[in-house]
Amino acid sequence: MSDPEMGWVPEPPTMTLGASRVELRVSCHGLLDRDTLTKPHPCVLLKLYSDEQWVEVERTEVLRSCSSPVFSRVLALEYFFEEKQPLQFHVFDAEDGATSPRNDTFLGSTECTLGQIVSQTKVTKPLLLKNGKTAGKSTITIVAEEVSGTNDYVQLTFRAYKLDNKDLFSKSDPFMEIYKTNEDQSDQLVWRTEVVKNNLNPSWEPFRLSLHSLCSCDVHRPLKFLVYDYDSSGKHDFIGEFTSTFQEMQEGTANPGQEMQWDCINPKYRDKKKNYKSSGTVVLAQCTVEKVHTFLDYIMGGCQISFTVAIDFTASNGDPRSSQSLHCLSPRQPNHYLQALRAVGGICQDYDSDKRFPAFGFGARIPPNFEVSHDFAINFDPENPECEEISGVIASYRRCLPQIQLYGPTNVAPIINRVAEPAQREQSTGQATKYSVLLVLTDGVVSDMAETRTAIVRASRLPMSIIIVGVGNADFSDMRLLDGDDGPLRCPRGVPAARDIVQFVPFRDFKDAAPSALAKCVLAEVPRQVVEYYASQGISPGAPRPCTLATTPSPSP
């Protein structure tokens, strides 16, 4: 029985958006010798491209006289799926006390994105000199690993018996508080149980909280447990306390049916009473850890992001030969379709191993018979609509425009259903191997809104997300209904979407911003949607691919 006056510590949300922390482990092979007598003293400097400049974020230790170093110091970064996060790895010789790569100390460098590293788990690249040529046979290997444990949850069940009675005319009303010890040795409240009225042998309700909340993911961090007798005045009577760690709690309940117990000690009584033993006993009846999988768990476990593009070729875009057309191919400035393609596709392609993307058009009359189609391959190869990388999608788009007649209406359901077909096959495997993301670029209101709602509701039960970017200055108010931010989307028959899978953004909100701003906005929801889908299906990530840096240790620094 709980009391509203107690101000219970709320349970944290099950899933939070934001960054994951990634650790990069680095090794090099075959570094160039600066002279014939000595081997280099290598160090790797990591830079991140941020705010239009390269900024040093981490560096390894220096290893002495080693041409194939395996560095022990990890390079830690915050990872965001929706950001490009370009990285540079600079290798230099620190023999003469150098702290940065100069011409005389530079051994080579390489560039890649953090997304490329985490999607492949292990990346090996040649080192390049400043003139762009390879540094002999020198290579650098980077292995990514997510910092684990930060998303795990703990289920705990406590009871107590023979607690001291603090009430004159009735029994105590016990509750318990749990505190963790911070780095500065202060105590922070992490949980407060409910009050059990008039009972010296209380059984508190099971509760669940994140491992981060309980002990900051440090199983050795001291935990303090305080038991009180509740008083409505707020002056609760102290019964006793004990200390433990999460590791001790796990070990004490490791076997089925095994429980752990502590004496509940009141230090004042212990110091004053010679025969004092305890003020009761507290028992931990259950301690289980629930692994909450993250987006990176699925990506590093082999899940690929299958990216498909759908482009609106309806007449409302305007004649492509006109400078006022949304499809105008100006040599000076890429149109909004191209800008959105590059911004969003440039990130998604890092998560697809073959980097081949199906690209479709809708709302145009197409050769040879110039009949209206709402899901035609823009490379005009219906048997193989895939394009090589985003640059291939852009090239196909440019070749396609002069060959088609912009028409209408703006029907989106056919392309959603087309992408849903392979997603349906993927669902039947029961594995987390491929998640589909459909990018729809359109200039106006959807004509087949009822059919589109039905298609989205169906797709919400599949491993699939939909990103809609509105191009131009049309009224997109109806499009926002598909987003589901104001409540679950329903099909015309009233069936609700199983989850929110649509993100709609008008491009005009970002036309004066950096391209990365659009990508950040439209892709921010994808990691949550991926995790939500697989969690709802009870599908765990695949085992991370085994990665090793080297078979022999480097010389000591």
Curated annotation (Swiss-Prot):
Widely expressed in the brain. Expressed weakly in the kidney, liver and fetal heart. Expressed in melanocytes. Keywords: Calcium, Cell membrane, Cell projection, Cytoplasm, Cytoplasmic vesicle, Differentiation, Endosome, Membrane, Metal-binding, Repeat. Gene3D superfamilies: C2 domain. GO terms for biological process: cell differentiation; cellular response to calcium ion; positive regulation of dendrite extension; postsynaptic actin cytoskeleton organization. Ca(2+) 1 binds at D167, D173, D229, D231. SUPFAM superfamilies: C2 domain (Calcium/lipid-binding domain, CaLB), vWA-like. Residues 244-303 are annotated as: Linker region. Its main location: cytoplasm. One of its GO terms (molecular function) is phosphatidylserine binding. One of its GO terms (cellular component) is plasma membrane. SMART domains: C2 (SM00239), VWA (SM00327). Belongs to the copine family. PANTHER family: COPINE, COPINE-6. This is Copine-6. It comes from Homo sapiens (Human). The gene is CPNE6.
